[in-house]
C-alpha cells in the first residue's frame, strides 16, 4: 500500500524542473557506486545462488543443514532482486523514463521494506545455521531431541514472520506527494516522514500521535533486534565454531587401527567436519561484509548526520557478501564442485538427447512419406490383381463344368470297349 497523495495546483504543471531536481541520486558518488558496481554483483549473485539451489535441493542431499542453506540462498536472491530497482534509479535511461519514475516513486518505501525484510531474514538464518553447526559439533547427541520441533520448516517460518513484523514499519513510515510538471512530461515525488512536524503546504500533520510514536520507536527496535543482536551473536558463535574446528582437526589424522563401527563413526564425523568448514567460510564472509552495514544502520538511528557515501559503501559490501556464497561453496567443498559438474553434464546430455530425438523424429516423418506412397501403390496393384483373379475364377468355373461333363461322357464311352476287351481276353 503506497502512501502517495496528489497535491492540487493550477500553475505548477507548466513549470519544468532542472536535471538536479529530477535526479534520483543524492550525490554523484552514490550514483557511481550504486549504479555501476551493484548491477554486476546482483547478476552474479542471483546466478550463483540459483546454482547453489540446484545442488542443495537435490533429492539425495536434503539434510537439515542443506535445507537451511537453501533457505538462505532464497533470501539472498530476494534481497538482490529488490535491490536492483535502487541501482536502476541511478541510470539516466530509467531516471528520465516516466513509467519508471512513477513505479519507483510510488513503491520506493515498499521496496525498501522488502529489502530490509529479506536482509533481516538472511541475517537470522546465518545465525541459526552457525548455531546448528556448533551444536552438532559440540553436542551431537542433543540434536535428535531438538529435531522434532526445531525443524527447518518451523525455524524458517518463525524467522520470516518475526522479521516481517519488525520491518513492517517501513510500509507506513513516509507519506509521498506526486505531481506532473512540464505539461505532464516530468513526474516528481516528494516524501515526508509520518512523524514530521512540517507537512505539505505547511499544513499541520494529520497523523495520530500513536502513529508518530510507532514510526519513531520502530527504527530503533529494528536496529537492535534485526541488525545489532544477530550480527553480534553471529560473530561470537563463529569464533566458537572456528576454535572448535581447530580442536577437532587433530582427531581426523589418518589411523591404521580403526575398524568396524569406529571407522564408520569417524567417516561420519569427517563429513560433518567438512560441512562445518563450508558453513564457517560462509558465516565468516557474512560477518566481514555485513558488520559495517549493521553498525552504520545502528548509529544512523541515534546520530543524525550525512551517512550517504558510507551507506553506499556498506550496501556494496552487503551485496558482495551475498554474491560470494557460490564462490565460497566451490572453494570450500569438493563434493559441491563434483555435484555441480555432474548436474551440468547431465543437463547438457539431456539437451543433446532431446535435440537428437527431435532431429531423428523429423527425418523419420520425412522419409516415411515416399514409403507410404509406395505402399499405397502396391496396395492398389494388389486390389487390381485380386479383382482380375476373381473374374478369371468365375469364367473358369463354367469352363470346368462343361469340360468335366464332356470328359465324363468320353470316359464312359471309352470304358465300354475296355470292358469288352477285358471280357474277351479273359484267361478264366
From Swiss-Prot:
Record's subcellular location: Cell membrane
Main localization of the protein described in the UniProt heading: membrane
GO molecular function: G protein-coupled peptide receptor activity
Transmembrane segments: 31-51, 68-88, 111-131, 155-175, 223-243, 279-299, 310-330
Extracellular compartment segments: 1-30, 89-110, 176-222, 300-309
InterPro entries: 7TM_GPCR_serpentine_rcpt_Srw (IPR019427), GPCR_Rhodpsn (IPR000276), GPCR_Rhodpsn_7TM (IPR017452)
Protein name from the UniProt record: Putative G-protein coupled receptor F59B2.13
Ranges per topology, Cytoplasmic: 52-67, 132-154, 244-278, 331-428
GO CC annotation terms, alphabetical: plasma membrane
A Pfam short name: 7TM_GPCR_Srw
Protein family (similarity comment): Belongs to the G-protein coupled receptor 1 family.
Record membrane topology: Multi-pass membrane protein
Positions annotated with a glycan in the UniProt record: 3-4, 183
PROSITE patterns: G_PROTEIN_RECEP_F1_2
Keywords on record: Cell membrane, G-protein coupled receptor, Glycoprotein, Membrane, Receptor, Transducer, Transmembrane, Transmembrane helix
